[in-house]
Amino acid sequence: MRITRHTAIGLLAVLAFAAAGPATAQGRAGEPVQTKPDVCLPPERLFDGDGDVTRNRKALGSRDLCLRLDVFSEGQLRWVFQIIQNKKHAAGPLWVVPHDDEDVAFDSAVYAVLRYGGTVVAVERNGDRYNRIGKRKQDPNRNFQVRGEGKCRLQLARSPQFTRNLMRWLHKGQPVIALHTNKAGYDLVPEPDEEKSKGNVSIGIERAEDSHITEFPAARPIRAKSPNDTLIYVASRQKPGNVAQLSRFVAALNQSGIHVLYEHVARNDCSLSNYAVWRNLPYVNIEVVDGDDTGAQTRMIDTVMRLIRSGQGPQR
């Protein structure tokens, strides 16, 4: 048989495809591809650019969980969400991991969704905190769009699709629980750019009189790698002390050894906490220092869920 140049190119393409290994409609493990409706992926097929899934592979292999990818573009930004849903107890909290460089937060989310149900939405950025376009970058936690409002200062553009795709996993009446890790210590002058900051989430910071953050330190803090960086954020449009239910929640956290930062939201900054306040959603942010290996974050999750289930959460 005479092999023409065209035939040779075709044969090479077939051989290259075969060498690449089997593929499915969901794409290979190395390619983030939108998961089809009603399809659940095994852990080894869930796109994992930085080892989060690999590190939690055994737990994520539970038959109770359904793993998916949500892949979409909005403006110039391409987004990949890892969706982890508890099929047996879907009507639970929405666990949000906005930053892909915060490994402990992802691990805690897997623990939480298995124990308490609901759905995890984790932003997958190959281990990067930001979604980048050249020299510009978007912090996922400054990309929550309140309907009818314009672009916030730290947004590259308005983000209704990002917000809709993430928040659609929230069941009515359930809380939004953000999971984060943070740098040890803090900046004397607040620095919003995390890449320049020495830390901005701590208890015991000397704050300006007009600060929108009020500290409620615990008398006997729980065991943690860095106790002053181990805390819970709550948020409200009302000043501290003006919302009885939220005040009781803060007091109960303090009694359980958990520091609390109370954010008085006067102006929307497109963070998840501000979005939740504007939408009147129950919201908690659970923070530990980077690399905490004491289990402090999962213990705080247990405390928060105990209070919520007993009617002592941030909202009734």
PLM region spans:
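Structured catalytic-domain cores with a bias toward divalent-metal coordination
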Residues: Q26-R316
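Bacterial N-terminal signal peptides that target proteins for export
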Residues: M1-I9
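Bacterial N-terminal signal peptides
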Residues: I9-A19
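Sec/Tat signal peptide C-region and signal peptidase I cleavage site
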Residues: G21-A25
